[in-house]
């Protein structure tokens, strides 16, 4: 899958305002009710990621979960990253 251009990334980010661009990754931090809720959320993300064959970097800090997406094989952001971001956003409603 080809890397997205800067213009394509900006267009995609406009549709995902809760995500931001940091060092060739898109990132979002989620705040959950408590630690068990954070783990349940991460488990749901894990199943989505496995089904997509695309896995985020995950950082859990009590009730906060930071997700970072990039396509390592492409050396940057691709449609895969934004498709998974959209699926993750759907979980949160």
Curated annotation (Swiss-Prot):
Keyword Oxidoreductase appears in the UniProt entry: no
Catalytic activity from the UniProt record: (4aS,6R)-4a-hydroxy-L-erythro-5,6,7,8-tetrahydrobiopterin = (6R)-L-erythro-6,7-dihydrobiopterin + H2O
KW Transferase (keyword) present: no
Listed GO biological process terms: tetrahydrobiopterin biosynthetic process
Pfam family for this entry, one: Pterin_4a
GO MF annotation, one: 4-alpha-hydroxytetrahydrobiopterin dehydratase activity
Enzyme Commission (EC) number: 4.2.1.96
Keywords, sorted A to Z: Lyase
Signal peptide from the UniProt entry: none
Gene3D superfamilies (UniProt xref): Transcriptional coactivator/pterin dehydratase
Highest rank taxon of the organism: Bacteria
Family stated for the protein in its record: Belongs to the pterin-4-alpha-carbinolamine dehydratase family.
PANTHER family the record matches: PTERIN-4-ALPHA-CARBINOLAMINE DEHYDRATASE
Protein's UniProt name: Putative pterin-4-alpha-carbinolamine dehydratase
């Amino acid at each position: 899958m080809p890397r997205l251009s800067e213009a394509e990334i900006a267009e995609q980010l406009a549709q995902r305002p809760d995500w931001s661009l940091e060092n060739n990754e898109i990132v979002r931090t989620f705040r959950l009710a408590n630690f068990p809720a954070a783990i349940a959320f991460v488990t749901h993300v894990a199943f989505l990621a496995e089904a997509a064959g695309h896995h985020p970097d995950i950082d859990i800090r009590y009730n906060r979960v930071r997700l970072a997406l990039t396509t390592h094989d492409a050396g940057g952001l691709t449609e895969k990253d934004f498709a998974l971001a959209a699926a993750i956003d759907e979980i949160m409603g």
